[in-house]
Amino acid sequence: MADDGMLLNFDLGSGPVKPQVKFKGGRWRDRKQAEKSARIASGKQSQPKSSTDGPDDGRSSKRQRTDDGDFDNGFDYKSANRFGSRPKHFDNDGHGGASGQSRSHQSDGKSKQVISRLFSFNPAQKTEADEKQGEWTAPEATNAPLSDVANFGTLTISARLVDELGKMGLERPTGIQNKVIPHMLTSSSDAFVQAETGSGKTLAYLLPILHRVLLLSVKGGAQIHRDSGAFAIIVAPTRELAKQVHTVLEKLIRPFPWLVSTAITGGESKKAEKARIRKGVNFLVATPGRLADHIDNTKALNLSIVRWLILDEGDRLMDLGFEDDLKKVITALKAVDVSDTLPDGTPLKALPERRVTVLCSATMKMNVQKLGEMSLADATFLAAKKEDMELDVQKSEMKAPAQLHQYYSVVPAKLRLVTLISYLKSTFSRRGKTMKAIIFISCADSVDFHYELLRDPNTTEAPVAASKEAESISKTVSKAAYITSPASPEVVLHRMHGSLSQPIRTATLKSFSACKSPSLLITTDVSSRGLDIPSVDLVIEYDPAFSFADHIHRVGRTARAGKPGDALLFLLPGTEEGYIELMKGSTTPTSQSYDSILQKGMMTKLEFPVETTAKPEDGHSFHDKAESLQLHIEQRLLEDTKRLELARNGFKSHIRAYATHTKEERKHFDISELHLGHTAKSYGLREAPGGIGQGVERKTKKRTNKGVEKDPEQAAGDERQNQNIIRKKSMMLMNSAADEFNIG
């Protein structure tokens, strides 16, 4: 055959040709292991190429990965937005100086110290921050005592009650008290009371009840005693609110030893509660579940004398799922005839002829209207202002007190933690008086992490006087680190959430209320309703509330009874900025940039409670100090296994809680826009932990009866049915409002 000029570019070498072995059968892992062993035996295992190899000379070198899991440009590509696409808008370098210094520190090659860059590759803020802020002038307080009313005596209540109110520092009634007290003193009709938070609803219904009961004891004071029966039942949604109402009631009846009140709540001993009911009580403050339990099981609880049923915080009662318990209570009361006399024959002419139900709520949501239809009959609508009474109930919305100064700060996720510490440090440093602040966080695990992080590790005992409650608060009260200053050398830190036992929660709340030093409470929404804590100057919503109604109740912990107050809301750049328009429906919020917060907080010297390699110097800019603080926290967590685990758990719970906002507001909190890597930075983590949203592990093999084999079609049908059940439960969870599991 003639030579056709073709050349074969094959070099088979001089060695014998070995046949290719293909592994079949067995498990996948076994086949892979066998292939790897064969490659090693044949000398064909891949080796790293030399840097002098010709074909690779033109390839660009990869960016060096630092110890914290990030490339040298400061962006966490690995964890970027696992739920969706990467956020579109990023500033290449919002603060070039800080970013440039960070690069120079790493590029010198002499130091391998990790640099936590916080000011580069952050999402761009969509709304413009208003930096032209003057001194904010508070408008006229909407929940303050009325100036045109001389005192409580003008409302024709008992003079001894007026004296007790004077000892409590209360001289004049508020607007809602001026409406409700005269109505309940003279009328026997049901009432719906609508008023903003902090307006004094508790005294509005307690004072007329006590006045009418005291009229029975005017002549001699011997007709009424503790075993005369329960005249009023007050239902509160949370244990803390029930305890607070009971405390106020105890102060009011102090001059009347023949009157007795008690509180029955979940978490307490039912045996002790039964003993108190058996001895006799005149005023019963209860949570719905425990009250329904005693109605079923405590025979000593006589409902025939009950003249008033007060449903406090009706919207929260329905939100927390107490509808069935409330139905049971209302049905039991309706089934009992109202007695005209006491068991000893004393007439009850001063009391209403029928049982009166009073529903208190700050909103007129559909579930509240449902509760009203279930409990009220021909009710009178009472509000503080005439214009509120003329509003259509479908359009009435909650509003915060007018004198409350609300402002917000759009903070990138990476900067949230250092911004929070800076704000607390500057706040406590400029206050020369005793002050209290509350931080609201979305979940209990996150509360535990932030408490342990801000707690001074060198403090072993709670900074309170020795008492029987000292042991209860030993793990919930401590001296604070990072946020102290020469003006406030000692700040007392508290934590509270629903996972703590009731005695610990009660003792912690009491400690925070009575604390004489500057103090900070880190809590969930368990502290957002009805609690009247004195001298709260500031509320920080570190995590936005699950619903706007919860937001109003959170900020309502300050600016109570006409006093001024401040509230700061942290928001992320992006979809969360749409929440600002929702806020403008009830107030005029003021913006504050995170740069100004960091600059004020980093003016004073930072003091670290634990020594690490990160040591901020006074001469550096506030950008450098913020990055040094972040690096210090990361190093501290790496050296402390306990706090590192708390940070991981807090991060996971935070992500899960982020998906539980109400359906109407979920557009502002899009989890697909949440950057997990940057959010992990706010927990002092260098990379986002895994295991989010995996759910419960399920076994692949299903148990079947021995000797019985399921029909394939039947098995497939069962599987589809189980999947439908899981899907329905998931949809119910996603579409529902925040429940008690969200509040810790």
Curated annotation (Swiss-Prot):
Residues 182-382 form the Helicase ATP-binding domain. A motif (DEAD box) lies at residues 312-315. Residues 1-113, 685-724 are annotated as: Disordered. The keyword Signal does not apply. One of its GO terms (biological process) is rRNA processing. Residues 43-53 have a biased composition (Polar residues). GO terms for cellular component: nucleolus. A motif (Q motif) lies at residues 150-178. It is an enzyme of class 3 (hydrolase). GO terms for molecular function: ATP binding; ATP hydrolysis activity; RNA binding; RNA helicase activity. Its EC number is 3.6.4.13. Residues 27-38, 56-68, 706-721 have a biased composition (Basic and acidic residues). Belongs to the DEAD box helicase family. DDX31/DBP7 subfamily. Present with 1460 molecules/cell in log phase SD medium. ATP-binding RNA helicase involved in the biogenesis of 60S ribosomal subunits and is required for the normal formation of 25S and 5.8S rRNAs. This is ATP-dependent RNA helicase DBP7. It comes from Gibberella zeae (strain ATCC MYA-4620 / CBS 123657 / FGSC 9075 / NRRL 31084 / PH-1).
